[in-house]
Amino acid sequence: MKNDINYFTSESVSEGHPDKLCDQISDAVLDACLRDDPESHVACETFASTALVLVGGEITTNTYVDIQEIARSIAEEIGYTNTDFGLDCHSMAVMNMIHSQSPDISQGVDGTGLDEYKGQQGAGDQGMMFGFACKETPELMPAPIMFSHSVLRYAAKLRKEKVIPWLRPDSKTQITVKYEGFKPIKIDTVVLSHQHYPDVQYDELKDTLINRVIKPVLGPTGLLADDTKYFINPTGRFVIGGPFGDTGLTGRKIIVDTYGGMGRHGGGAFSGKDPSKVDRSAAYMARYIAKNVVAADLARRCEVQLAYAIGVPFPVAVRVDTFGTGEVPEEKIEKAIKEVFDMSPAGIIKTLDLKRPIYKETAAYGHFGRPEFSWEKTDKTEALKKAIK
């Protein structure tokens, strides 16, 4: 890309957004299964509406999972403790509609399907997954999505600590960044909509959210300007929220979960899925690969696509795109990737140590750009450089 002026916008939603409530419940169920039975097969979906949480899907596990307790504890942890907030963890109905995994799927995953793949763990489904990394932030993530997550994470902290006592759980933000080529040069626009108690005045709400939430988070980036535009609760009121205001469903925030629209998405959601589902595990591996490519200074931007067929124990395709920023040809990077990384479903699980109860923490504020997760390590840079030579 030339050094043209351009703008890119990404949004995030808070842990109290109805869809994120559902993601967190689904991943908490997954964690409960993996904690006692790492071989659990889980595809857990959650639906939340007025006074109701419904948990369904396919689970095969050797442990007992208390769906009622998990759903209520997650809602309480988020802050849904009063019907006025959009949901009450104590009085809401919780329905359990879970059943076991299809044996037709299971035989492909367990290595008991076609003779040519006997004994090898196959992919849990077909599909393509993308990973992305760039040098816009220290986390090697796109700036708009990282900034959006950071604002909402800080707002939730102030809400839970009652520093801003009139905030309620539901919120979302959207940030537009001005670029010169691929370089962020200014935060152009910040949109923040936050649920609140009915008695707070709009002027106080707007001033507080700008000066006590947005500026403390985004100020240190050096990208806020005097003419940065702020749109705070643009309708003027956001009292009704949570599942009462909008129905929630697992897997409806896949762009929030990944790169904010910068970098492609294969379409598969993450939450509620055990690591045999390549929708999740291969997307994590693709991020791991792309981040190591960028950290190794082989490119300033990198997108990796992996593709799988159900029951097949290896990727059917691998693709690399450096958007013209590569220091070496893409075919060389692709060849090095195939040498350095084990992209088989079993290899991904082993490399990233994915049969652990780590998933509930991924289910709000993005799955990427967070150093606590194994797919964010940059421990393959030297191996990649060596493989390039």
From Swiss-Prot:
Binds 2 divalent ions per subunit. Binds 1 potassium ion per subunit. Its EC number is 2.5.1.6. Mg(2+) binds at residue 19. It is found in: Cytoplasm. One of its GO terms (cellular component) is cytoplasm. Keywords: ATP-binding, Cytoplasm, Magnesium, Metal-binding, Nucleotide-binding, One-carbon metabolism, Potassium, Transferase. Residues 101-111 are annotated as: Flexible loop. PROSITE patterns: ADOMET_SYNTHASE_1, ADOMET_SYNTHASE_2. Pathway: Amino-acid biosynthesis; S-adenosyl-L-methionine biosynthesis; S-adenosyl-L-methionine from L-methionine: step 1/1. ATP binds at residues 17, 170-172, 237-238, 246, 252-253, 269, 273. It catalyses: L-methionine + ATP + H2O = S-adenosyl-L-methionine + phosphate + diphosphate. InterPro entries: ADOMET_SYNTHASE_CS, S-AdoMet_synt_C, S-AdoMet_synt_central, S-AdoMet_synt_N, S-AdoMet_synthetase, S-AdoMet_synthetase_sfam. One of its GO terms (molecular function) is methionine adenosyltransferase activity. Catalyzes the formation of S-adenosylmethionine (AdoMet) from methionine and ATP. The overall synthetic reaction is composed of two sequential steps, AdoMet formation and the subsequent tripolyphosphate hydrolysis which occurs prior to release of AdoMet from the enzyme. Belongs to the AdoMet synthase family. This is S-adenosylmethionine synthase. It comes from Treponema denticola (strain ATCC 35405 / DSM 14222 / CIP 103919 / JCM 8153 / KCTC 15104).
